[in-house]
């Protein structure tokens, strides 16, 4: 049985879906005003891995990852660029999909857009007002009254008083409490707006996910995921909105209380992936260590980046550096070299359990333990290297495939990747042919010169009785 660390209860719990025939997972997606960065890459890869594993375990999963296509940043960027919001959104949604495809991330089953769900958001806000959880302000905004939700702060583990003292809150004379957050923003000149009972305006960020998840999944569902930075306030606010509107919780006995109040959530399991740091520092544009996925993929093969992300446990901080990416590249190269030297036979995991498969499955069932699962892959590769057993090589490829690795032709991986060395495959093959002729002519100086030239471009040659093969270093 799969065990999942639940951020809400701060402990591992057996995964027991509300309806085993209809497992539902919602992940907060991207705000599409710029190219995706490494933090986005981690969210995409981590929850792709989780979706793949749940399906491997036989669960019929519906995976939803939303797109925020209306936001202050989107409005500002479109104005700055002199383009419409629709044009900006379309451009960066396409770029997001291209980045995800490159990283081997399967498309979610549903990708709802915020602007396609405005009526649902308005309806939820109306319900919150009727339930005494929200109030219209004199300026045309609508706010959530956090004091009216007794369990507020349960996800972050803080009381309202703790939050008021420790968090920077917006000073707003229209709020009843500084911690109250906006559900509906009154229209501003030149900004997109929709009609509502409170006047023209647009939704706040937090209500978007509550309304979209409720529209697709109903009042309760199994898994809600996202980056650790969303735990507070975004996910905290989602709970307040969703439970405040429906009055329904997931029915799970979380066996805990929050400052004297029973824990109440519409979601059974809350999952959060850890932060990405760059050379030990927080990734930020102000520090000049902010990297988009596209920038990284100019230097590294996309599968290397995916492998780098999966080598760390999803909840742990992940430290990005060239040294760590180079190490990941070398490690993945070793696995593909094994599959090059011993071509994989067909292997059916459902019919061929062995010690390696059992340990891999046990690792993944323990809160998606990719660190231990990847370690099993390397032990298995070591056995394949010793035995040249094509059946075991097939097992290696099949296990890697569960988490989206090792599915390419080994030669294509070893000779492919980001071509930052300046030599195309054709140029390399030509140099190798010239070196072969030089060796046949016993022109050792020319042969060495070509080898040195290839080494300068990080092209590694492997001479054997069957000829010369090569890979990018």
Swiss-Prot record:
Binding residue positions for ATP: 285
CDD domains from the UniProt entry: Anticodon_Ia_Cys, CysRS_core
InterPro entries assigned: Cys-tRNA-ligase, Cys-tRNA-synt_Ia_DALR, Cys-tRNA/MSH_ligase, CysS_C, Rossmann-like_a/b/a_fold, tRNA-synt_1_cat_dom, tRNAsynth_Ia_anticodon-bd
The keyword Lyase is annotated on this UniProt entry: no
GO molecular function: ATP binding; cysteine-tRNA ligase activity; zinc ion binding
Keywords for the protein's UniProt record, in alphabetical order: Aminoacyl-tRNA synthetase, ATP-binding, Cytoplasm, Ligase, Metal-binding, Nucleotide-binding, Protein biosynthesis, Zinc
PANTHER family documented for this protein: CYSTEINE--TRNA LIGASE, CYTOPLASMIC, CYSTEINYL-TRNA SYNTHETASE
Subunit architecture: Monomer.
Name by which UniProt lists this protein: Cysteine--tRNA ligase
Organism per entry: Neisseria gonorrhoeae (strain ATCC 700825 / FA 1090)
């Amino acid at each position: 049985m799969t065990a999942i660390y639940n951020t809400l209860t701060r402990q591992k719990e057996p995964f027991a879906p509300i309806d085993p025939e209809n497992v539902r997972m919602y992940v907060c997606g991207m705000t599409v005003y710029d190219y995706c960065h490494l933090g986005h890459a981690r969210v995409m890869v981590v929850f792709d891995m989780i979706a793949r594993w749940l399906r491997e375990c036989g669960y019929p999963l519906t995976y939803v990852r939303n797109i925020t296509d209306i936001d202050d940043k989107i409005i500002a960027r479109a104005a700055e660029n002199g383009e419409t919001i629709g044009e900006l959104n379309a451009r960066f949604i396409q770029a997001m999909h291209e980045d995800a495809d490159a990283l081997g991330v399967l498309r979610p089953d549903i990708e709802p857009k915020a602007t396609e769900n405005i009526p649902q958001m308005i309806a939820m806000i109306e319900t919150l007002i009727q339930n005494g959880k929200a109030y219209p302000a004199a300026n045309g905004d609508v706010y959530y009254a956090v004091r009216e939700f007794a369990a507020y702060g349960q996800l972050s583990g803080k009381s309202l008083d703790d939050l008021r003292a420790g968090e920077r809150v917006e000073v707003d004379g229209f709020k009843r409490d500084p911690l109250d957050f906006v559900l509906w923003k009154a229209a501003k000149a030149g900004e997109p707006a929709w009609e509502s009972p409170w006047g023209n305006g647009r939704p706040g960020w937090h209500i978007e996910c509550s309304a979209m998840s409720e529209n697709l999944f109903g009042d309760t569902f199994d898994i809600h995921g996202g980056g650790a930075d969303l735990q507070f306030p975004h996910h905290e606010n989602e709970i307040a909105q969703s439970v405040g509107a429906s009055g329904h919780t997931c029915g799970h006995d979380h066996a805990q209380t929050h400052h004297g109040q029973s824990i109440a959530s519409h979601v059974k399991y809350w999952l959060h992936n850890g932060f990405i740091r760059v050379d030990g520092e927080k990734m930020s544009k102000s520090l000049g260590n902010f990297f988009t996925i596209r920038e990284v993929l100019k230097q590294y093969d996309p599968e290397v980046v995916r492998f780098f992300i999966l080598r760390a446990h999803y909840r742990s901080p992940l430290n990005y550096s060239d040294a760590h990416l180079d190490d990941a590249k070398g490690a993945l190269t070793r696995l593909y070299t094994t599959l090059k030297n011993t071509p994989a036979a067909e292997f059916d995991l459902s019919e061929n359990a062995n010690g390696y498969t059992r340990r891999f499955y046990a690792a993944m069932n323990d809160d998606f333990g990719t660190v231990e699962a990847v370690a099993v892959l390397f032990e298995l590769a070591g056995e394949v290297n010793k035995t040249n057993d094509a059946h075991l090589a097939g097992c290696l490829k099949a296990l890697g495939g569960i988490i989206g690795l090792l599915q390419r032709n080994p030669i294509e991986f070893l000779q492919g990747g980001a071509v930052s060395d300046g030599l195309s495959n054709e140029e390399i093959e030509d140099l190798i042919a010239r070196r072969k002729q030089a060796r046949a002519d016993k022109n050792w100086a020319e042969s060495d010169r070509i080898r040195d030239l290839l080494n300068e471009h990080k092209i590694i040659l492997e001479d054997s009785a069957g000829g010369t093969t090569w890979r990018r270093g």
